[in-house]
A protein has these predicted regions:
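Residue-identity detector for glycine
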Residues: 6-7, 11-12, 26-29
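Glycine-rich phosphate-binding loops of nucleotide-dependent enzymes
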Residues: 26-279
Length: 279
């Protein structure tokens, strides 16, 4: 079941239906959005138009859906709008057309702190840790909106990332790229999100560390978190994802299961050969 937690619903009843989701007021006034299982997506970007500068669009009608418990892979050539898509979903790039919904709620152009409250986590590609803070302090920063659950969530993260527990007092600035990626993922998971957005989690890592990152992503997904992952390592991404999308010039040009896309002659000819040369 998908869930997203945040503040109380102003003026709302304790329980009401939004499309396929039931919204309940949980403990400590948290907003709990529970998926009711009728086949609707937990996250949907529909006809998305977005860009950084006025009058210049990077996304030109992009469509992506993630259903509860899915791992979605987003691939495509450089400049296709992959990272922009995640940033637009997370409120970091202005959306000028289309919509983004989370469990039936319109979250288009919502601020990042509100999206964290609602159950969306985001791990950027760069500058994704606080280098002068320890590992544990980095994780604490991920739960600043709900500090009462700190001990519980730290225990959960150290179970999922044992190495972080062993080195919790070490400053993040001294970690390797793969270790920093683990810290960034764990911090995003501290709020127990229903959806996790990953922007090129294997970028800059050795092949061994890339494999570890993909396995860890699958493990996170197996806990019930829906994952939307942008990746330049296209072939590896398609091997582990449930469904995938190919972005080109700001639009979704192809979609299907990971295996379908990996075996699609057009995708192989137009994208996989080029992308394989980049990784």
């Amino acid at each position: 079941a998908a869930r997203c937690e945040g503040g109380t619903e102003a003026g709302g009843s304790e329980s009401r239906e939004i499309d396929s989701c039931k919204i309940d007021t949980g403990q400590e006034g948290q907003l709990m959005v529970v998926y009711t299982g009728d086949g609707a997506p937990v996250l949907e970007a529909k006809d998305l138009v977005a860009g950084y500068l006025p009058g210049i669009n990077i996304l030109n009608g992009c469509n992506v859906r993630a259903y509860p418990g899915e791992l979605i892979g987003i691939i495509g050539p450089n400049g296709a709008g992959k990272s922009t898509l995640l940033k637009a979903i997370f409120g970091l790039v202005p959306v000028r057309g289309g919509s983004v919904t989370l469990a039936g709620q319109d979250i288009t152009n919502s601020k990042a702190n509100r999206l964290v409250q609602l159950g969306v986590g985001f791990v950027p590609q760069n500058n994704n840790v606080f280098p002068t803070l320890t590992i544990e302090e980095n994780l604490q920063m991920g739960l600043y909106l709900r500090p009462r659950l700190l001990a519980q969530r730290l225990a959960a993260m150290y179970e999922l990332f044992p190495v972080l527990g062993e080195r919790r007092s070490q400053r993040a600035g001294g970690l390797s790229g793969g270790e920093r990626q683990s810290v960034a993922m764990a911090r995003a998971l501290m709020m127990d999100p229903s959806v996790l957005l990953l922007d090129e989690p294997s970028a800059g890592l050795s092949p061994v560390r890339q494999d570890e990152t993909f396995l860890r992503t699958r493990r996170i997904n197996a806990t019930g978190v829906s994952v939307v992952m942008v990746e330049q390592n296209a072939r590896r991404c398609l091997q582990i994802c449930d469904r995938g999308y190919v972005l080109d010039q700001g639009r979704d040009s192809h979609s299907g299961t990971g295996h379908e896309l990996a075996d699609d002659p057009k995708v192989i000819e137009l994208y996989l050969g080029t992308l394989a040369d980049e990784v």
